[in-house]
Structure formats: structure tokens, C-alpha cells
Amino acid sequence: MAQNLKDFAGRLPAGPRGMGTAMKLLLGAGAVAYAVKESVFTVEGGHRAIFFNRIGGVQQDTILAEGLHFRFPWFQYPIIYDIRARPRKISSPTGSKDLQMVNITLRVLSRPLASELPFMYQRLGLDYDERVLPSIVNEVLKSVVAKFNASQLITQRAQVSLLIRRELTERAKDFSIILDDVAITELSFSREYTAAVESKQVAQQEAQRAQFLVEKAKQDQKQKIVQAEGEAAAAKMIGDALSKNPGYLKLRRIRAAQSIAKTIASSQNRVYLNADSLVLNLQDDTFTRGSDSLVAKQTKK
């Protein structure tokens, strides 16, 4: 480039001697600035760089950290890698142990091993994740999922995820790739299997509902039996009380008469009824004779 500028300056028309000297100084300064610019480069945070020179190729023993670095222009140029963890989602259809088709989506956090960048560049280039991850994920998923039934993939999801992560991490080490996290984000089955599972769940819920109704009927029956036994015991106690104390029935009739009288007194309507039918005439002989006859009948029983 500097030589081209000098040739261009030589083709310009000749001028005063001072102007020619200034032009030469300007061209020299431009050449120096260009050389300095091409000799310096910066490695940003979270990145690493390796050198490729035009004679020996990739320099295996040089890995440049973050910051400002120098190089020989034209003879060397840097290759910069991003070594931060990057997420990637990979989906793979595979078959379970009971021959059910399963679609699994994994979220993988991957980054290159910084100490192996020269080796990685020679084998895989800069797009290492695109070349490696889809193939090894499919390989590991098929080998792991084939060990479980479709139902076990749901009930033992944590165990399946742990096994996938362990095998995938070991497999990625062969390509100098570090996996910081592997997680199952989606797990789906074929329409036929999903419909069969839903039908089974509905049948189980109906069976549980029927069992609940049977248990409820049994509890209601027991409650009625207990209630009937309680009413029978209460009737027996009343009968015993009548046989031992005839005045108990008279007391009950007096309380009933009081309740009837209170209800009629508080009513806005006025109704005239036979006093005998309302058992309000407590001084009448019929009241006493009626009570005594009931006590006699109860005693005979």
C-alpha cells in the first residue's frame, strides 16, 4: 500500500520543493499509521484468539486472552472464538422401548474448551456447534430413550434427563466442547398414543368416581342405621320414663299446650277452635283421663 502511494505521488505534477517534501512526509505518516493499525488488534471480553501465519499454519502453542495484541501484518492474522456459553435447542424424533414414537427437545448450553482452540479450528472451524451438536444429541437421545417405556419417560423424567446429560457431556468432550447444562424442554408423543393415554385417564377417573359413590352410599346407610337405632333407643327411654313416672306425659302435654297458646297469641289472625283438640284446658278431667289411659297402654306393652 505504501509503495502504491509513492507511485501515485511520483505521477503528480512537479511543484515547489517545499510542497514535495510535505507530501512525502504526509505519505510516510499515512504508511506508518496504516502499518500500526494493521499490527494491532483487540480481543473482546469472553473471547479468545489464535494465530494463523502464512508459513506454518495454525500456531498450536499460542492462545491469546482478552486485551490488546500485536501481529505481523499480512504474515499473521487472528482467529477469534467466543468462549461464552451459548444456548441451543435441538429436537429429535426417536423410539421408546415399547416402540412408541417420542419427540424430544433439548436445550443445550455449550462452549468451546479454550485450551483446545487451535485443535478445534483445524478439525471443526468456527461453526463447531453446528457441525457437532445436532449429530451427537440425536445419537445420545436414541440410545437413552430406547431404554425406557413411553410411560416411564413421563414418570421418571428426572432420571431420563440426568442420564441424557451424563452421556451427552462425555460425548461432547471428544470434540473439546463443554456442556454447562442439558435440559428436556419438550416431550411429546404421537396422536394415537396421546389419545389412548387420555382415554385411560378418563376411565380411571370414572372408576374412582363410581367407587366414591359406592363408599358414600355405604356411609349414608350406616348413618341411617345409627339414626334409627338412636330413635329406637329414645323411644324405649320415653317408654321407660312413662312406666316409671306417669307425670312425665302430663308435663309434655303442658309444654305442648304452652307452645300452642304462645303461637296463637302472637298470630295476627284470630281462629276459634275446640279447646279439647288443642289440649289447652288443663283443668278438665278429660286431660287427666287421656294421659292416664296412655300411661296404662304403655305399661301393658
From Swiss-Prot:
Top-level taxon in the UniProt lineage: Eukaryota
Disulfide linkage: none
UniProt xrefs under Pfam families: Band_7 (PF01145)
CDD domains xref list: SPFH_prohibitin
Main location: mitochondrion
Keyword Cell division in record: no
Cellular component annotations (GO), alphabetically ordered: cell surface; cytoplasm; mitochondrial inner membrane; mitochondrial prohibitin complex; nuclear matrix; nucleus; plasma membrane
Ranges in coiled-coil conformation: 191-237
InterPro entries membership: Band_7, Band_7/SPFH_dom_sf, Prohibitin
Region called Necessary for transcriptional repression, residue ranges: 19-49, 150-174
Gene Ontology BP annotations: mitophagy
Location(s) in or outside the cell: Mitochondrion inner membrane; Cytoplasm; Nucleus; Cell membrane
GO MF entries: protein homodimerization activity
Record key words, sorted: Cell membrane, Coiled coil, Cytoplasm, Membrane, Mitochondrion, Mitochondrion inner membrane, Nucleus, Receptor, Repressor, Transcription, Transcription regulation
Subunit annotation: The mitochondrial prohibitin complex consists of two subunits (PHB1 and PHB2), assembled into a membrane-associated ring-shaped supercomplex of approximately 1 mDa.
Family: Belongs to the prohibitin family.
Chain's role: Protein with pleiotropic attributes mediated in a cell-compartment- and tissue-specific manner, which include the plasma membrane-associated cell signaling functions, mitochondrial chaperone, and transcriptional co-regulator of transcription factors and sex steroid hormones in the nucleus. In the mitochondria, together with PHB, forms large ring complexes (prohibitin complexes) in the inner mitochondrial membrane (IMM) and functions as a chaperone protein that stabilizes mitochondrial respiratory enzymes and maintains mitochondrial integrity in the IMM, which is required for mitochondrial morphogenesis, neuronal survival, and normal lifespan.
Protein name, per record: Prohibitin-2
Source taxonomy: Eukaryota, Metazoa, Chordata, Craniata, Vertebrata
